[in-house]
Amino acid sequence: MEYQHWLREAISQLQASESPRRDAEILLEHVTGRGRTFILAFGETQLTDEQCQQLDALLTRRRDGEPIAHLTGVREFWSLPLFVSPATLIPRPDTECLVEQALARLPEQPCRILDLGTGTGAIALALASERPDCEIIAVDRMPDAVSLAQRNAQHLAIKNIHILQSDWFSALAGQQFAMIVSNPPYIDEQDPHLQQGDVRFEPLTALVAADSGMADIVHIIEQSRNALVSGGFLLLEHGWQQGEAVRQAFILAGYHDVETCRDYGDNERVTLGRYYQ
């Protein structure tokens, strides 16, 4: 079967996807090892029998809703290719907004940055790649996530990052940071979106929090006060309807200069503040 023939068939079978053509192209790129430009320019290239079998198996899994990133084992974030697994969240484009806001507020001089609940290491590795002069500490309470983030750091040859197993601040007693960032669990366990799309295949522990999704956010806001240098920043990603509640939590905890930034879809996505000791 030719590349172009397989693409046509795959696109027709993936109409339930938000991006059937791109999904099909990614699977074809993954199995053949060819780039998109080659595939489109040489569409008459023949697939081997083995490639056809691999593609059919992947197509079935994608048709059943399994995330593309789980099928290929890789997701790009901040132009960094990251290994992913069902043990962690798949990095989302909107989380790059958190990285942008963090970079804009880091001091010019070298400093220490903490990423709580690092998962794949996406946020921490993006910051480390942009600020090689800074020391980044990334923590996660799940051993599989810690191993995956360490694998990503090693694969990308990023040296200015230390990845530890820690339940939020439990392994960080006495340490202080100029900035703390986190994309914590923030979805209400009753949210119907948990039964839709990619999140069905992701760990609930990385998605769901008590108190209508606010429990971990409030915990981080309160505990970060002891871990920030005076004037240090805390930046948190949250749900698009949680902006007001998160701002109030920052203010109640005594943070200053509290503001919420919008994501690429113009939704409130990242709230930040400064804490003065």
From Swiss-Prot:
<dbReference type="GO" id="GO:0010468">
    <property type="term" value="P:regulation of gene expression"/>
</dbReference>
<comment type="similarity">
    <text>Belongs to the protein N5-glutamine methyltransferase family. PrmC subfamily.</text>
</comment>
<dbReference type="GO" id="GO:0008276">
    <property type="term" value="F:protein methyltransferase activity"/>
</dbReference>
<feature type="binding site">
    <location>
        <begin position="183"/>
        <end position="186"/>
    </location>
    <ligand>
        <name>substrate</name>
    </ligand>
</feature>
<dbReference type="GO" id="GO:0018364">
    <property type="term" value="P:peptidyl-glutamine methylation"/>
</dbReference>
<dbReference type="GO" id="GO:0102559">
    <property type="term" value="F:protein-(glutamine-N5) methyltransferase activity"/>
</dbReference>
<feature type="binding site">
    <location>
        <position position="168"/>
    </location>
    <ligand>
        <name>S-adenosyl-L-methionine</name>
    </ligand>
</feature>
<dbReference type="InterPro" id="IPR040758">
    <property type="entry name" value="PrmC_N"/>
</dbReference>
<dbReference type="InterPro" id="IPR007848">
    <property type="entry name" value="Small_mtfrase_dom"/>
</dbReference>
<dbReference type="GO" id="GO:0006415">
    <property type="term" value="P:translational termination"/>
</dbReference>
<dbReference type="InterPro" id="IPR019874">
    <property type="entry name" value="RF_methyltr_PrmC"/>
</dbReference>
<dbReference type="InterPro" id="IPR004556">
    <property type="entry name" value="HemK-like"/>
</dbReference>
<dbReference type="GO" id="GO:0008757">
    <property type="term" value="F:S-adenosylmethionine-dependent methyltransferase activity"/>
</dbReference>
<dbReference type="GO" id="GO:0003676">
    <property type="term" value="F:nucleic acid binding"/>
</dbReference>
<keyword id="KW-0489">Methyltransferase</keyword>
<dbReference type="GO" id="GO:0006479">
    <property type="term" value="P:protein methylation"/>
</dbReference>
<dbReference type="InterPro" id="IPR002052">
    <property type="entry name" value="DNA_methylase_N6_adenine_CS"/>
</dbReference>
<feature type="binding site">
    <location>
        <position position="140"/>
    </location>
    <ligand>
        <name>S-adenosyl-L-methionine</name>
    </ligand>
</feature>
<comment type="subunit">
    <text>Interacts with PrfA and PrfB.</text>
</comment>
<dbReference type="Pfam" id="PF05175">
    <property type="entry name" value="MTS"/>
</dbReference>
<feature type="binding site">
    <location>
        <begin position="117"/>
        <end position="121"/>
    </location>
    <ligand>
        <name>S-adenosyl-L-methionine</name>
    </ligand>
</feature>
<dbReference type="InterPro" id="IPR050320">
    <property type="entry name" value="N5-glutamine_MTase"/>
</dbReference>
<dbReference type="InterPro" id="IPR029063">
    <property type="entry name" value="SAM-dependent_MTases_sf"/>
</dbReference>
<dbReference type="GO" id="GO:0036009">
    <property type="term" value="F:protein-glutamine N-methyltransferase activity"/>
</dbReference>
<keyword id="KW-0949">S-adenosyl-L-methionine</keyword>
<keyword id="KW-0808">Transferase</keyword>
<feature type="binding site">
    <location>
        <position position="183"/>
    </location>
    <ligand>
        <name>S-adenosyl-L-methionine</name>
    </ligand>
</feature>
<comment type="function">
    <text>Methylates the class 1 translation termination release factors RF1/PrfA and RF2/PrfB on the glutamine residue of the universally conserved GGQ motif, i.e. on 'Gln-235' in RF1 and on 'Gln-252' in RF2.</text>
</comment>
<protein>
    <recommendedName>
        <fullName>Release factor glutamine methyltransferase</fullName>
        <ecNumber>2.1.1.297</ecNumber>
    </recommendedName>
</protein>
<dbReference type="Pfam" id="PF17827">
    <property type="entry name" value="PrmC_N"/>
</dbReference>
